[in-house]
Amino acid sequence: MTKSMTATRKGIDNTPGAGEIKNLGDVCYEILEPLRAWADKPVIITSGYRSEALCEAIGSKKTSQHAKGQAVDLEINGIPNIKIAYWLQNNVDFDQLIMEYFDPEDPAGGWIHVSYNENGSNRKQVLTFDGKKYTEGLPEMKWKDGEVV
């Protein structure tokens, strides 16, 4: 949840503090473990905790929930991201759920950003980002031969 090639390459300390570690644990317990149990496959975390310095180095905001240990970007091999996003929307408590860089022609493209705020103020905000703009909600799932594509 903390490994970063950018941090390694640039010599950035990406070690979370006690508060961030607690938040990462909450994300694991409330979101990642239920998702792993449903999928019966490993959940691949492409980005977890990011220090403020790392956020700045990659062009993200220092106020990102990643910097607080409250957010992860993820994928699961063999399951379309849209199917994962719909499952998360309907089965876990979350603050923000974003289908990042969604392309309807490539169900494996992009990734899912999901965050959790343990203080009970989760917004349940659902967005889709196509690389240019954010829209509210998730796109409609496409089906072929009884499978989500």
Predicted features by range, described:
Residues T8, L54, T63:
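Glycine-rich, flexible loop/turn motifs
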Residues E33-S60:
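Extended, low-complexity, intrinsically disordered C-terminal regulatory tails
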Residues M1-W38, G131-V149:
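Extracytoplasmic cell-surface/polysaccharide-interacting catalytic and binding patches
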Residues K62-I82:
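Acidic, His- and aromatic-enriched active-site or binding-groove loops in soluble protein domains
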Residues V27-I31, K41, L54, Q70, ...:
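Amphipathic alpha-helical interface surfaces
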Residues I44-T46, A71-E75, H113-S115:
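Structural recognition of the beta-strand scaffold that forms the well-ordered cores
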Residues A57-A67, F102-E105:
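Short, flexible, solvent-exposed loop/turn segments with mixed acidic/basic and small polar residues
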Residues I76-V149:
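Catalytic cores and adjacent binding grooves of peptidoglycan-active enzymes
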